[in-house]
Amino acid sequence: MPRKERDEKRRDNKGRLLKSGESQRSDGRYAYKYIDTFGEPQFVYSWKLVPTDKVPAGKRPCLSLREKIKQIQKDLDDGIDTIGKKMTVCQLYEKYTRQRGNVRKGTQKSRQQLMKLLSEDKLGAASIDSVKLSDAKEWALRMQEKGVAYNTICNSKRSLKAIFYMAVQDDCLRKNPFDFQINEVINDDTVPKVPLTPTQENELLDFMQNDPVYAKYYDEVVILLETGLRISELCGLTPADLNFEKRFVNVDHQLLRSTEDGYYTEAPKTESGFRQVPMSAAAYEAFERVLKKRRDGRCIEVDGYKDFLFLNRDGLPKTAVNYDAMFKCLAKKYNKCHKEPLPDVMTPHTMRHTFCTRMANAG
């Protein structure tokens, strides 16, 4: 083919010479064909050949083709996956969680919660290569403005840092936009957890013991205060977990419940979670009273465990939600008739916090 004819084929409708890989479509849009890091042909498009060109009326502003080519060439030179970097944040998170599927049910629920937050926010639909440090910080601010708890934002940010780290390792990105300190962006507005003072502890137990409504919960609160058990560990206790001869409580599982799965058990998160908790004299007596007063409940077995110690009014094992509601109402009633109110945050964990504080102070 003569040189003149070849040059005419490589010029745009303005007479400008097009470089290798560049072309112009019949609608006026420019195209560039290149081979990605996997050896596959790819195309990018633009309404402008160079930055000084004007975008046709009615078309969205865009980078010129040659600006895009420059970016692509830099990515290819650096070994960046030019296709992978275009996946959305939601797609990246889905890829990350799919590769790490062997997790606890609690972790699964946390993942679902984060995916929901991402799907409802503009960050989720953004391509990962477009997310900058300032975008990540703006996301944290939006979450706090939305009313998401500080600890939830911290955990979510930690997960997002992990998925973007994977993207960097996979050569989809050069930098991790979530590599920053969260406390530099948002304030910790979490209400501090305060343990009961010795006076509050004694007065609370006296109040419960003599109250017609809360007397039935007295032994459970004594056990929590004397053992420091997590509420899910308390809920999972069966007679087989109590060793009265050697005076200890065996902890190797916890009982939980969800709307989707119903009752289920989980082992402690770490090896140190498997333990034998000593029974104090008060805990020993409380457990004896619990067994003596325990009524027969429904015949229910959860993952091989049965005969749970603490049952609700329907004869089913209690779970954390039962105690959360109880402690909230207990604190409200107690505060009405006591000058020194209980801590603002009064939950089953307050009992564990009180126990741990007492042990630490005792040395």
Protein language model features and the residues they cover:
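Short alpha-helical segment immediately N-terminal to, or the first helix within
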Residues: 143, 223-224, 358-362
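Basic, Lys/Arg- and aromatic-enriched nucleic-acid-binding interface segment
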Residues: 154, 169, 173-175, 179-237, ...
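Proline-centered turn/helix-capping motifs that create local helix->coil transitions or kinks
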Residues: 168-177, 244-246, 253, 291-301, ...
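Conserved tyrosine-mediated DNA breakage-rejoining catalytic core shared by Y-recombinases
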Residues: 237-295
